[in-house]
Amino acid sequence: MHKFLALGLLPYLLGLLNSTRLTFIGNDESDTAIALTQIVRGLQQSSLAILALPSLALSDGVCQKERNVYLDDFLQRLHRSNYKSVVFSQTELFFQHIEENLQGANECISLILDEPNQLLNSLHDRHLGHRLSLFIFYWGARWPPSSRVIRFREPLRVVVVTRPRKKAFRIYYNQARPCSDSQLQLVNWYDGDNLGLQRIPLLPTALSVYANFKGRTFRVPVFHSPPWFWVTYCNNSFEEDEEFNSLDSIEKRKVRVTGGRDHRLLMLLSKHMNFRFKYIEAPGRTQGSMRSEDGKDSNDSFTGGIGLLQSGQADFFLGDVGLSWERRKAIEFSFFTLADSGAFATHAPRRLNEALAIMRPFKQDIWPHLILTIIFSGPIFYGIIALPYIWRRRWANSDVEHLGELYIHMTYLKEITPRLLKLKPRTVLSAHQMPHQLFQKCIWFTLRLFLKQSCNELHNGYRAKFLTIVYWIAATYVLADVYSAQLTSQFARPAREPPINTLQRLQAAMIHDGYRLYVEKESSSLEMLENGTELFRQLYALMRQQVINDPQGFFIDSVEAGIKLIAEGGEDKAVLGGRETLFFNVQQYGSNNFQLSQKLYTRYSAVAVQIGCPFLGSLNNVLMQLFESGILDKMTAAEYAKQYQEVEATRIYKGSVQAKNSEAYSRTESYDSTVISPLNLRMLQGAFIALGVGSLAAGVILLLEIVFIKLDQARLWMLCSRLQWIRYDRKV
């Protein structure tokens, strides 16, 4: 029995040995060159990189010479077909050439004239496996290498060319099936005695291969992030240990997803593309961030779900995964699933003090102009009335001079004096005299007119009447009506403080009012703060200054936790995140209690995949169809509507229960603050305060008048006493 078993295994072992060594047939150099030329032309590319190493397997000088001969012939035929080629004899230069093409997003085809097991590890270590790079291995073997010996793992694209007989070549491809085992499959062949290549193009396209995954199972990291994923964690699923990133440890930590927009999207994709998925818990329950600047080029430079993708332990990653330059170096993104914008949420603007409502109908910059207008209206009115009296005065030579009780007639003096007297002209008043205390009357008249008090006509002149009409129109239609309408509006709907809806206002609030800004840990919003410029950099510096003792003090586990923090009374707190995520979480606690800022910057969310993912094109096609048909927007709106219905049902239930106890009054009061409320005595506090201030000012002025009158009487008595003493001294 053992003899027959050994004889059965002998052909298999001989096949393995035969597949790993070079086998050349004499005088077949032109056949090999022709076949390789046809194979390369079947790829329909215009350039080719060739790696021809002085392999140790070619110890025989004849074999080495024969390979050089067919290589030269192959290059000549390739150049005749207008192909560009570059030949490398050193692996380092060859790898650098591949890296430069990948950095420029250029498709690169390489022909390696050596066995794959010598270069496979280097290709994986240097992350050269990509859907844009194709490696063609030909070393003259009759059979392809066994999957037990060599495994070509995704995303590495490999073509193995074998030569089972003379003028016959077989082409094996590792991505001919959508499964993840990457086994070599026969996809084409070349027959020199027939028509050459069996089919053109040489390889099946990735769109056709990965249009149907045929039940392939993908691992998807997930964590609780409404409205994208609603996750329920199992017992002790979040335990930090050193081996958390191992695949066995990750699969042991089970989670249960109960809903979410991206959960629905993933179910739709799995149904359309025929694959299955398995949720695993993302390390740290975060999207992931860069560990340090020193290890950014390593294979595990990111944490969280992005770190699982980078290390190849996961296939997809959804859940508002924002695009950024730092993340793009570690993973790739599909067509965007959400066009969003950055924003921050704070508490709703608080109601202002109702006692000062009488000052709010006009803005602060209007009150100075209004007060100056009222102050200068009196002097202007006085000038309009007094100018005619001033104009009617005339200069004339008076014949009679008054010197106390004496009357001097200038005509008589001219007659009795030999010399001529120089007479000075004097002002002669008109018959109509200026009213007594006209200036004070004008001041009080304008004040009573602007304050809508009853007042008599001050002057009969047409100029004064015209100005009185102008003042009355300004006081009635401009000031009184506008002020009354605004004040009525303020009483009907009490005013609130200015909202904090811009970065400038948020920065001022953090500096002057002690506001604290929170952000989800290891999120794209945190990367925007860390790597941003101008205001974002200043805000990040303020955040770090406010929590000097606790460097992680401004981190929150999720946006939902930040909104809950504000809802519980955090009136001096703000949360930065995606606007859609903020809006959804705000709906849970009542949109009237929060204030969303303006759109700060544009951000896109997409499905994250591994670098060089071979099925990214197929995934993009499906996502673009969903986006163009509006299905993505409908899914988002449906998730919002579902959550809104749940919130309304919860609110109605709580209202019916709390209406029977003492807390119903506080609920009603908080609700009444958002709608039009009737006038109450609290709103009229400002009028009584103004009355009290006016009464106090009047009392102070009266007291000052009494004091100054007494001082004037004392000074007059002292002056009279001095005059009496002076007269007495003169008489003596």
Curated annotation (Swiss-Prot):
Main localization, broad class: membrane
The residues forming the signal peptide are: 1-19
Alphabetical GO biological process terms? detection of chemical stimulus involved in sensory perception
As annotated in Swiss-Prot or TrEMBL, what is the tissue specificity of this protein? In the antenna, detected in sacculus neurons which innervate the first and second chambers (at protein level).
Residues crossing the lipid bilayer are 370-390, 466-486, 689-709
Q: What happens when the gene is disrupted?
A: Response of sacculus neurons to changes in humidity is abolished and consequently larvae fail to move towards their preferred humidity.
Name of one Pfam family that matches: Lig_chan
Query: So which stretches are on the Cytoplasmic side?
Result: 391-465, 710-732
User: Where are the Extracellular topological domains?
Assistant: 20-369, 487-688
> GO CC terms on record?
membrane; plasma membrane
* Topology with respect to the bilayer: Multi-pass membrane protein
Intracellular or extracellular location(s) = Cell membrane
| Keyword set, alphabetical order | Behavior, Cell membrane, Glycoprotein, Ion channel, Ion transport, Ligand-gated ion channel, Membrane, Receptor, Sensory transduction, Signal, Transmembrane, Transmembrane helix, Transport
User: Which GO molecular function, any one, fits this protein according to its record?
Assistant: ligand-gated monoatomic ion channel activity
Q: Which residues are glycosylated?
A: 18, 235, 299, 531
- Annotated function: Integral part of a neural sensory system in the antenna that provides the neural basis for the response to environmental changes in humidity (hygrosensation). Together with Ir25a and Ir93a, mediates the response of the hygrosensory sacculus neurons to changes in relative humidity and is required for dry detection behavior.
- State the family named in the UniProt similarity comment for this chain: Belongs to the glutamate-gated ion channel (TC 1.A.10.1) family.
Under what name is this protein listed?
Answer: Ionotropic receptor 40a
Q: Which organism is it from?
A: Drosophila melanogaster
